[in-house]
Amino acid sequence: MTRLALLSTSDKTGLVELAQQLVNEYGFTLVSSGGTAVTIEKAGLPVTKVSDYTGSPEILGGRVKTLHPRIHGGILARRSLESDVQDLTENNIQGIDLVVVNLYPFEETIAKQKAQGITDPDQALADAVEQIDIGGPTMIRAAAKNHAHVTVLCDPQQYASYLQELKHGEGETSLPFRQACALKVFERMASYDRAIATHLRQSLATTDSQTQLSILGTAKQTLRYGENPHQNAVWYQESDTASGWAAAQQLQGKELSYNNLVDLEAARRVIAEFAQAETQPTVAILKHNNPCGVAQGETLLQAYEKALAADSVSAFGGIVAMNRAIDTDTAQVLTKTFLECIVAPECQPEAAAVLQAKSNLRVLVLPDLVSGPAVTVKAIAGGWLAQAADETLTPPADWQIVTQAKPTEAQLAELLFAWKVVKHVKSNAIVVTKDHTTLGVGAGQMNRVGSVNIALQQAGEKAQGGTLASDGFFPFDDSVRTAAAAGITAIIQPGGSIRDKDSIQAADELGIVMAFTGTRHFLH
């Protein structure tokens, strides 16, 4: 009896070449459904349509095609079990030896919707639901379960290795190969189901507590090492459809490292605060996950030069993120400093040519610098902690000006700039700014006044007339008094201390503007 292959694919990549080999080299009989059968027929190959094979037409607009005993009996039958073989014979069912199925493009559909912008959420959800595959998962799960007798391919990238396996095995596949294929199926299904559950949760905006946490990724790249050379590391992308950094285009430079990716993500979060079209050109320079220079300017070059001047020592070997396309003038200046990575939404061809002078410099283009993970996860002994990403930014209209001195429009704009930056500095975090440029950054100190001192010391005399932002409230008035002594004229902080009145009184005494946002931005 000839061997039977069942093919039903959404992604037709490599399909014809595979079918040709199956028929011409290994004598398979092909059974196929819908568009897959049409593609095979157009290639001049013999193929039996599923509806003809089962004797049942496709119904419900194609929703039911392969859910039939002749299909699933053929897949699930254990050839080594006499009773299964007898059932096949009595029901005129032939055993299926190969299942080639890839799933409806659910992830691609929702990614396309996000890229195009969703104007009708209900219709978008309905369109996404139509891409939830039923027959495909059923077939590949059945084949994976019966991998002792059936080979299953759920990804076109497997076709070449399968044909090599047939060649070396004289037309047969080995058990280890089939086991690996079965594992691939269950990994794919876990990823697929997770994408569906995540999208439904977001689309339905459920407020119910999430009782299960599913973390599943597809290995994109084995990294040279982790934070340190003795630590192994792998880069996983969220799904089979590349998004975020997995979708970024690396124009040049060495392979990305673990630390590069961690710092790039931190840089993306900072620059995302300044991604609106009306925002001035903005540049953020980061080192070890903390901003060391953030600035805005009339041009991208001016913004970069201001950010670099904010702390040129720390910028050495840093990460640079920009909210505008890299232009030639900026590229020429970028090459004068040793940098690890640069990321921007675009890079002009002439600028890319200039940057090639630094062959090791990693230059990445990520058009969408705004979209990031909705949830952040940290591993702890015995489990994980998950929280909503800190995407809140309290607008000036919701601030409370708690001092007698009131801010000017220019001070409000400066306070907003400082507030956007301090949100992305490790706690306890203090940022001193002026002219939409960071002058001093106090990060990661165990007491707040310690971070104040570091930021002010770094700013030096430039702190005169500057603005100070704090990610958390001031427990005492010492930070306010220290800031005033350095020449700070406006402060922004969350408020919420039982001693807020002491800080307010000190600010009034010293003639400082102070705004409370009501929102804390701890970052650990």
UniProtKB/Swiss-Prot annotation:
Superkingdom assignment = Bacteria
What Gene Ontology cellular-component terms does the record carry?
cytosol
**Catalytic reactions of this protein:** (6R)-10-formyltetrahydrofolate + 5-amino-1-(5-phospho-beta-D-ribosyl)imidazole-4-carboxamide = 5-formamido-1-(5-phospho-D-ribosyl)imidazole-4-carboxamide + (6S)-5,6,7,8-tetrahydrofolate; IMP + H2O = 5-formamido-1-(5-phospho-D-ribosyl)imidazole-4-carboxamide
Q: Which PROSITE patterns match?
A: MGS (PS51855)
| GO terms for MF | IMP cyclohydrolase activity; phosphoribosylaminoimidazolecarboxamide formyltransferase activity
Which Gene3D superfamilies does this UniProt record tie to the protein? 3.40.140.20, Methylglyoxal synthase-like domain (3.40.50.1380)
Give the GO biological process terms: 'de novo' IMP biosynthetic process
According to its UniProt record, the EC number is 2.1.2.3, 3.5.4.10
Per its UniProt record, what SUPFAM superfamilies does this chain match?
Answer: Cytidine deaminase-like, Methylglyoxal synthase-like
Ranges for the MGS-like domain? 1-154
Pathway, per Swiss-Prot/TrEMBL?
Purine metabolism; IMP biosynthesis via de novo pathway; 5-formamido-1-(5-phospho-D-ribosyl)imidazole-4-carboxamide from 5-amino-1-(5-phospho-D-ribosyl)imidazole-4-carboxamide (10-formyl THF route): step 1/1; Purine metabolism; IMP biosynthesis via de novo pathway; IMP from 5-formamido-1-(5-phospho-D-ribosyl)imidazole-4-carboxamide: step 1/1
Keywords associated with the record = Hydrolase, Multifunctional enzyme, Purine biosynthesis, Transferase
- State the family named in the UniProt similarity comment for this chain: Belongs to the PurH family.
Q: Which PANTHER family match?
A: BIFUNCTIONAL PURINE BIOSYNTHESIS PROTEIN ATIC, BIFUNCTIONAL PURINE BIOSYNTHESIS PROTEIN PURH
Question: What does the entry's free-text domain comment contain?
Answer: The IMP cyclohydrolase activity resides in the N-terminal region.
Looking up NCBIfam families in the UniProt record yields: PRK00881.1, purH
How is this protein named in the record?
Bifunctional purine biosynthesis protein PurH
| Protein encoded by which gene | purH
